[in-house]
């Protein structure tokens, strides 16, 4: 089997649902990848603690063991762009002005992603307020390109682009 972090979302969903891989194994693999790459790339910000991430994954495994799947994203770790609210995570907009404000509820599209079973574990870095051609802000700093560190990760969705390209 391909390394867990190299699977597409559809392949990962199938592997989780046919129980060839557990949600905990998936989370552990992605946390390992994040720990290896994110210090240099700075794609993900406001990452939940590994313990909280693994606890969510264990709960997802227990749901599957009981015959309950929330949907095709069940047990798959997901990061949300730091311009959108995800309950329990700060929505900073890449600005020090908003760093202490935690989201009280999910934005509608985030709620749909969560309802499909996704495990929201982090935010992706953005330029301040999502404005700018490069993902750099005073709060989290520069996001590097996941393929070529000498190139820009781009603006607005630079953190998301880097997270996907460096999988």
Tell what function each PLM region has.
Residues 1-56:
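An N-terminal boundary/leader segment
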Residues 13, 17, 61, 110-111:
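Solvent-exposed, non-membrane alpha-helical residues enriched in polar/charged side chains
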Residues 41, 59, 84:
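N-terminal Rossmann-like NAD(P)+-binding subdomain of aldehyde/semialdehyde dehydrogenases
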Residues 56-58, 62, 138:
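Short, basic phosphate-binding NTP loop
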Residues 60-77:
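Immediate post-signal peptide segment of exported/extracytoplasmic ligand-binding proteins
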Residues 73-167:
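Short glycine/serine-rich loop/turn segments
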